[in-house]
A protein has these predicted regions:
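Non-transmembrane accessory domains of multi-pass membrane transporters/channels
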Residues: 1-31, 71-87
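Soluble C-terminal extramembrane regulatory/interaction domains of multi-pass membrane proteins
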Residues: 30-153
Length: 155
């Protein structure tokens, strides 16, 4: 895996003080957890949900956009050694989506679904919650890599 090679080289440079950077392990572990989150989300979303559920969740589909924007801004912050972007957009989108999921559950719309669809629905719910946690960890890693606590992000 190319990421492991890059991390190994970065850690080697850090240890001999050629690069005054934080330890690479936490960032690597966070990126791997995020990768696993996206694999689970991809598997859960591989087949479309029934139309009734899609119609209820569609107004809250800005979750992907908010996460993509946060990841792009985090990558830019890492490269520039700036403070991490805020998570407000992600948190707001995930909160809205979670509220829609709670409403779907309270109304019993998942009770009549086939088992495989129900499993994918709840796997997606779980994966999004894990993703929220791991994005917070990424934000912390980006903060560690920032060169100055006085610098702030544009987000």
């Amino acid at each position: 895996m190319q990421l492991n090679l890059v991390v190994t080289e970065a850690e080697r440079e850090r240890l001999v003080r050629l690069s005054p950077t934080p330890e690479t392990g936490p960032l690597l572990r966070t990126l791997l957890r995020l990768r696993h989150d996206f694999v689970i989300i991809g598997r859960a979303a591989a087949s479309p949900l029934p139309q009734a559920l899609q119609a209820r969740l569609e107004p809250h589909s800005d979750v992907g956009t908010a996460i993509a924007e946060f990841l792009r801004a985090s990558g830019a912050a890492l490269l520039a050694r700036r403070r991490p972007p805020g998570l407000d957009g992600v948190e707001s989108a995930l909160h809205s989506y979670a509220a829609a999921i709670d409403t779907v559950r309270q109304e019993g719309l998942t009770r009549c679904l086939p088992n495989d669809v129900t499993e994918r629905f709840f796997a997606l719910c779980f994966a999004l919650e894990q993703l929220r946690h791991n994005l917070r960890d990424l934000q912390g890693c980006v903060a560690e890599w920032a060169t100055s606590p006085r610098q702030t992000s544009d987000s």
